[in-house]
Amino acid sequence: MLLTPKMFSSWLRQDVKKILKRKDSDAGERGKALEDLRASLFNRFRSPETPKRQQQQQHRICGPTVALTFNFVVAISIIFMNKWVLKNIGFEFPVFLTFIHYIVAYLLMALLKSFSLLPASPPSTKSSLLPLYTLGIVMSLSTGLANVSLKYNSVGFYQMAKIAVTPSIVFAEFLWYRKRVSFMKVVSLTVVSVGVAVATVTDLQFSLFGACVAFAWIIPSATNKILWSNMQQRENWTALALMWKTTPITLLFLVSMIPFLDPPGALSFNWSLTNTSAILVSALLGFFLQWSGALALGATSAITHVVLGQFKTCVLLLGNYYIFGSNSGFISVGGAFVAIMGTSLYTYLNTRGQSLKTSSSSSALSEKKSRFSDLKDDDKNLEPYGSEAV
């Protein structure tokens, strides 16, 4: 049978149609698979359970030891960097420097959000908006007033004011959350406070305005730490998600503080490449300081974070004495050692309390499991009579 050109062309068209149809079906299946994958990923990352899961993952990856170590290293680094910026470069605008820190932090978080790397936030309700606004306002007051206090007061007076934050946190947490502190922890906190006071008593230089700023900073600082800790532990916020929500509010209030607390002339500053680079490095460290502080507060408590700050002061004082040969005096060095002993005692009490909680919870869980297995055994024994029961 001869194959005519017309028959050949018709067969060819049929084959092409079959191939195209098969390709369309394959493409449709592939597109459907991609849509299903996209939907599953969206549900996984944006479901109501996602913030809680991400917070649990944050605690697994960054536990108390990692978070406190991270915050300790970054805090010491930014102290030297900010000292370089404020003294050597001559950037005498502490609130504006804080504003730059938060601007850089917000840009970095926006970059993370554009790549879908920013953790999801818990569902917003009317009752959850008030703590967010409160935290944003308190953060602006805490960080802004802290830098102003460092400008007008010595480091010793700044640390003496920080001692008052510890009893403020204990009193506020008792009023708001009915948290109680054991007698031994009160003793260890007292030892830490006395040690820091003795260590910094030789460096108490302040002005009247600086003293007013330092005492005005105590309540916002204590409130800031309490809110950061409790919003992460009770409302399933991660550190970065909470920073993303509160930073715009903080920036708004920092702008309103600049005319009252900063001298004029920030825009006429010598913005050379060296000066700008130093300020940007300080801002980058500021982002890491805020992030590490949030991680530490979420993993531990507000009091533990304050104790870490006082321990950092004593380590810096001893480092200057032993490494750089600074003449701090034997009284200051002795006070630093006393404060470190109090910090060690507080850490031991916290660790023992957490281990006791873990053991009690595990024993309670095993007891529940044993009771459940006993009930299952009883059901199995009664099973032959179950069909006759009415």
From Swiss-Prot:
Residues 356-390 are annotated as: Disordered. It is a multi-pass membrane protein. Residues 366-382 have a biased composition (Basic and acidic residues). The chain crosses the membrane at residues 61-81, 89-109, 128-148, 155-175, 182-201, 206-228, 249-269, 278-298, 306-326, 329-349. InterPro entries: Sugar_P_trans_dom, TPT_transporter. The keyword Coiled coil does not apply. Keywords: Membrane, Sugar transport, Transmembrane, Transmembrane helix, Transport. Residues 356-365 have a biased composition (Low complexity). It is found in: Membrane. The keyword Transferase does not apply. One of its GO terms (cellular component) is membrane. It holds the Pfam family TPT. It comes from the Eukaryota. PANTHER family: SOLUTE CARRIER FAMILY 35. Belongs to the TPT transporter family. TPT (TC 2.A.7.9) subfamily. This is Nucleotide-sugar uncharacterized transporter 1. It comes from Arabidopsis thaliana (Mouse-ear cress).
